Amino acid sequence: MSDKNSKQIRSKLTSDGNIEISIATVEKPIPLDDEVLIKVEAAPINPSDLGLLLSFAADLSTINISGSGDETVTSMKINPSLMNAMKPRLDQSMPVGNEGAGI
């Protein structure tokens, strides 16, 4: 990973009824004149983050892990009767967590 990139936990609800959890390499933002960029060394996963990460509808008995290293993806099935409630996030890879501790 270069100094221009960072890592993000992502959660994606696919149209075929799966939640996919992955770690994405993303480009670090370039701060404006009145902004700073901090290095995050630790970040918790709070209960509110788990709602986005796993969703209330995930069937944890269907967990599947594929790939390796930075290409690892964890997936699980979603209860089909609850898919309608989650339509707004279909096929969108969303970052999880917004708190952290940095230097």
Predicted regions: what they are:
Residues 10-13, 54:
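Residue-level signal for short segments within beta-strands and strand-turn junctions
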Residues 4, 22-24, 100:
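Short beta-strand or tight-loop elements
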Residues 48-53:
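Cytochrome P450 core scaffold surrounding the K-helix E-X-X-R motif
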Residues 20-23, 88:
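Residues that act as N-cap/strand-start positions at coil-to-secondary-structure junctions
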Residues 2-9:
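Short structural boundary motif marking the start of a folded domain
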Residues 15-17:
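Proline/serine/threonine-rich low-complexity linkers at boundaries of modular beta-sandwich domains
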Residues 29-43, 58-103:
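Glycine-rich beta-strand-centered segment in the early N-terminal region that forms part
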